[in-house]
Amino acid sequence: MIRAFVLYEGDVDPDRYAEHVVLCRAVPAAAFRHGRVFGAPMGEPKHRYYAEFEWPDLDAFKAAARGPEFAETGRDAMAMGVPFSVEFAELSD
């Protein structure tokens, strides 16, 4: 399983993010989830919002990553104006 996770440094506007979700759900073969970061083990959390894409395998991820839908989600995320980072992980049992 492959997961792309997005960590936003600030709060996102809920109405604007709802528009972003429509683009994210159009990425082929991916599950998409998102939500507010509400805490950390010690102190305040470094991030305020979290989103993730999930693909069943590396081939599905590679195919989606080459597509225009995935690229559009990145452009749209940048247009929201909230600093964020993206990382990719390969998960195993």
Model feature map: region roles:
Residues 1-66, 87-93:
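Short S/T/G/P-rich N-terminal loop/turn motif that feeds into the first structured element of a domain
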Residues 24-28, 70-75, 81:
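A common structural junction motif
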Residues 80, 86-87:
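Helix-adjacent hinge/juxtasegments
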